[in-house]
Amino acid sequence: MTTQFSVSGIELELLRYPSRQESNLQAWDAADEHLIKHLIDTEQTNINTAIINDNFGALTAGLLSIDPSWALTLETDAKTSLLGTTQNLSRNQLPTDTLTWVNSCDELPQGFELVLMKLPKNLNYFSHQLNRLSHVLPAGTRVLIGAKAKSINKSLLETIEKNLGAASASLTWKKTRVITCISDGKVRPLPKATTWSVPEFKLQITNLSNVFAANKLDIGARIMLDNMPKGDFKSIVDLGCGNGILGLHAKQVFPEAYIHFIDDSEMAVASARENWALNKLDNPALVGEQATFGWDDCLTHMSEGFRPDLILCNPPFHQGEAITDHIAWQMFLDAFRRLKNGGILHVVGNRHLAYHVKLQRIFKNCTTVASNGKFVILQAQKISKKALEPELEQESDLNSKLDANTEVPHPQSALYGKPKA
């Protein structure tokens, strides 16, 4: 894996997050290089700048290398992006006191004089981001968007003009181009969240713009809903929850359970929270918070005493533009560490991804629950702490520190910090 970022005299060491990913993926692409090169070539100086969709901090670190006092506002929907950017700034000994992080769902602050963006894979999300910018950018503000040349076409430029202002693309460099958009100062209405029904499960679903399966039930979730695990589960995690539909149905099937929704996407977590409220699934017989919502890199920051007895998982195999299985690996490893002894990991995935090999290696067991021509549902049970793989022993072994049957009292507000008073 290449870790040395070098462009126009700027030298950085950049890693993806988590840094244990496979070696053929790097923490930046040529579009990051092109944006930095463009700023240096045009002798851009320190002005109030927003950076949006900076995957692992290449743009942020680049600007701070030019001027450590550069005032930057960073917006990302991915927790791994936030953690990766923070990691790379520390690795390169760059300051963070001029940085402001903003929520992908809240209003943007005023006063930006320049915006740098990476084109996201999800164009509905991109349109939403442009709409948000139209609320805070005065006429004449430059927005520079880096993208692969093959992703830039007439339709994309028209989308930018419709949602923010006139746009034109640079010449190609390293198979990338920089789009320059000039804000026209007109405020666009923000798109409304998509709401749709799943009548066979009596659920209403709301999706924000960066959530997978925008207006319909995806095929993997469908087969999972039809094949929920059997048992008496009291603490259930919907890991990589998306809009939360698996956790919502789990509450229908196991009404005495407490459900915990976790995703790397802040918009996904917000959608799951909205859907919990929309479907009114609280059981009056239970006390405390019956659902918690965590914006997290898998189960990285869950409190150490948390021991669910069921984890539902529909792993993504993309991280941005990259196709990778490291997310599934991390989900399975985190599930093994966190599950109580006897706990179940219930997974759906494309057949060709061969998740059964990973689960067998980690859990020492794997059962096929259901399958069709494209998808398979697999189940693995944590039956012994001794099943820990040698490479896992190099990391923090929570199983050696805690009794795997330790229960955490409800409410579960302690999962992401101190309990509420």
From Swiss-Prot:
What Enzyme Commission number does this protein have?
Answer: 2.1.1.174
InterPro entries on file: DNA_methylase_N6_adenine_CS (IPR002052), rRNA_m2G-MeTrfase_RlmG (IPR017237), RsmC/RlmG (IPR046977), SAM-dependent_MTases_sf (IPR029063), Small_mtfrase_dom (IPR007848)
The chemistry this enzyme catalyses reads: guanosine(1835) in 23S rRNA + S-adenosyl-L-methionine = N(2)-methylguanosine(1835) in 23S rRNA + S-adenosyl-L-homocysteine + H(+)
One Pfam family recorded for the sequence: MTS
Enumerate the Gene3D superfamilies for this protein.
Vaccinia Virus protein VP39
Record GO terms (molecular function): 23S rRNA (guanine(1835)-N(2))-methyltransferase activity; nucleic acid binding
Any idea where this protein resides? Cytoplasm
Q: Where is this region: Disordered?
A: 389-421
* SUPFAM superfamilies in UniProt: S-adenosyl-L-methionine-dependent methyltransferases
Its keywords, alphabetically, are:
Cytoplasm, Methyltransferase, rRNA processing, S-adenosyl-L-methionine, Transferase
Q: What class of enzyme is it?
A: transferase
GO annotation, cellular component aspect: cytoplasm
What protein family is recorded?
Belongs to the methyltransferase superfamily. RlmG family.
State its role: Specifically methylates the guanine in position 1835 (m2G1835) of 23S rRNA.
Q: What is this protein called?
A: Ribosomal RNA large subunit methyltransferase G
Q: Species name for this entry?
A: Shewanella halifaxensis (strain HAW-EB4)
Ranked from the top, the taxonomy reads: Bacteria, Pseudomonadati, Pseudomonadota, Gammaproteobacteria, Alteromonadales
Q: Which gene is this protein's source?
A: rlmG
